[in-house]
Every structure is written in C-alpha cells, then in structure tokens.
Curated annotation (Swiss-Prot):
Its EC number is 2.5.1.61. Its cofactor is dipyrromethane. Monomer. The porphobilinogen subunits are added to the dipyrromethane group. GO terms for biological process: protoporphyrinogen IX biosynthetic process. Keywords: Porphyrin biosynthesis, Transferase. Pathway: Porphyrin-containing compound metabolism; protoporphyrin-IX biosynthesis; coproporphyrinogen-III from 5-aminolevulinate: step 2/4. It comes from Erwinia tasmaniensis (strain DSM 17950 / CFBP 7177 / CIP 109463 / NCPPB 4357 / Et1/99). This is Porphobilinogen deaminase. PROSITE patterns: PORPHOBILINOGEN_DEAM. The gene is hemC.
Length: 313
C-alpha cells in the first residue's frame, strides 16, 4: 500500500474537514508510511441553505457527491458525521468503521440565558432540526422556533448578530472545533434525546476494496459501533428520514445496552417514547423491537401524517 495514496472524500465545512483530518491522522498513526490525502467537495446540502433540509431531500444531500466520488474511483473512502448518513447505501458501498464517539448530546447556546427553562416567554430559538424543534415545542410551546441552516460558524454568527435569543447545536461539533466555551448547557437526554448516531464519525468504503477495509479496521470503536447499530436499526425499521422528528440514544455499561427512542410531530403536540434494555449482542434486535413498539403506540400515525405532506427522500 506504500505506493498508493488513500484518498478521503469530505465536505468542505470546517467540521467535516476536522473529521476527515482526524481519520487521516488516525490512519497514519496506525499505519506509518501510509499516504493519505483529502479530497474536499461541495455537496448539494452545503449549497441549498435557504430551505429546511426536510423539504429538499434530507440529510442524504450531504453524502451523495462523496459516494459518487468513491463509485467513480476518484476517492477511496468517505468520512461522515453519522447523524447525516441515510439508512441505506448505494450498491457496492457500505459503512466499514465507526470511530469513538464524542459527547452525543445537544448544546444550548445563548448570550443571556443558561438553559431552555430560563428563556422568557416568546423567545426566539434557532435550530435546523425537526427533532430538536419537536422536543423544544413540547417542553416550551410558547417559544418561537426559527429555522437555522449553515455551518457551525455561520449559526453562531447569526446568534451573535442578535437574530436569535438562543440556538441549539451538537455538543460534539462545538467541542471538535474548539468552541466548547460557547456551550451554556449540555442538554440531558431526558430534555433533548439526541439524533441517531450523533457525535460519531463513520467511514464509508467500496465493499470490494478489501485492502482499504483492512486498513480501516483499526479505527473501528466496538462500543460506539454497538450503540450506533442499535440506534440505526431502530431508525431503519421506522423508515425514518429527515422529515420526521426521530431521536434514538443508546448507552452501554459492561455488556448491557440501554436504548431510548422517540418519534414526534414537528409541532411537539404528539410524541411517542420507548426504551429497551438487553445484552449488547442483541443491539440490532433491540433497535427493531423498540421501533415496532413505537409504531404500535402511535408512531405509525405520526409518520403517515408527516409523510403525507413530505414524501420520504
């Protein structure tokens, strides 16, 4: 492999580049002498910033160009934020490694307030996520939730300009960019259940590229992979897309997995929650079982109502 350059397809945003450079460093540390280069790309999700993701095709807009680069042979792997990775992959591609997870919780960011509960009535809160919007609205129906797109720096800039009283971002993204001091509160999962895979970095690759898959094995973090597989199994069974508020969060203690999930309406008026506990070996089964319980308890009707207006991407 010493003569070959391993090329990483990545988005150009600061956070995406951080993730790609992290994988680059890890690969070189694990395989001294390996040559690794980045192939930064602009995706449709980076270009369409004036429309909520749910209306323009969902988070898959952030990965399609990267996948095309791998299929064409111009890139060998793609590095993704796991919360942006759709449940299905194009033929010939697959997820081959998940790196150790950063804090998966949501972050409350504000200049004048310390938490959602401290916000005054009618305060303006920015978020690009229907999952966050749903849980915020259920907790504080008096708040005004406004769409907020763009990279982390752009979103913080809009808060700093006074367009919002507070914004909700991912703790992981802020920490990775050295902006952890902007976090006023790490929101507990009981208040804001994280997104599927939030805080984890995944590596996608051509499934016939055995040599590259072998190189990536050292980067896979088994505990994170177990937790994310349970969360993604739930989402897959729900056929969840960006148009529906879905949260899923798994914790692993010793060999016992605790998986929580929710499906809600965007306005927060309807919300179905559930949880499962069991051995880590049953991670995917637990995800499927929890999804089926949620569907039986009302999630099916919520999903149908939302998709009637926005067919899944």
């Amino acid at each position: 492999m010493s003569d070959k350059i391993l090329r990483i397809a990545t988005r150009r945003s600061p956070l995406a580049l951080w993730q790609a450079e992290y994988v680059q460093r890890r690969l070189i540390a694990c395989h001294p002498g390996l040559r690794v280069e980045l192939l930064p790309m602009v995706t449709r999700g980076d270009v369409i910033l004036d429309t909520p993701l749910a209306k323009v095709g969902g988070k898959g807009l952030f990965v399609k160009e990267l996948e095309q680069a791998m299929l064409s042979g111009s890139a060998d792997i793609a590095v993704h934020s796991m919360k942006d990775v759709p449940v299905a992959f194009p033929p010939g591609l697959g997820l081959v490694a998940i790196c150790e997870r950063e804090d998966p919780h949501d972050a409350f960011v504000s200049h004048h307030y310390t938490s959602v509960d401290s916000l005054p009535q009618g305060a303006i809160v920015g978020t690009s996520s229907l999952r966050r919007q749903c849980q915020l609205s259920a907790r504080r129906p008096d708040l005004v939730i406004r769409s907020l797109r763009g990279n982390v720096g752009t979103r913080l800039g809009k808060l700093d300009a006074g367009e919002y009283d507070a914004i909700i971002l991912a703790v992981a993204g802020l920490k990775r960019l050295g902006l952890g001091d902007r976090i006023r509160q790490v929101m507990p999962a009981e208040e804001s259940l994280p997104a599927v895979g939030q805080g984890a970095v995944g590596i996608e690759c051509r499934l016939d590229d055995i040599q590259t898959i072998a190189l990536l094995a050292a980067l896979n973090h088994s505990e994170t992979a177990c937790r994310v597989s349970a969360e993604r199994a739930m989402n897959t069974r729900l056929e969840g897309g960006c148009q529906v508020p879905i949260g899923s969060y798994a914790l692993l203690e010793d060999d016992q997995l605790w998986l929580r999930g929710l499906v809600g309406s965007p306005d927060g008026n309807e919300m179905v929650r559930g949880e499962r506990r069991g051995p880590r070996a049953d991670a995917e089964k637990m995800g499927i079982s929890l999804a089926e319980e949620l569907l039986e308890n009302g999630a099916r009707d919520i999903l149908a109502a939302v998709y009637q207006g926005n067919p899944p991407a």
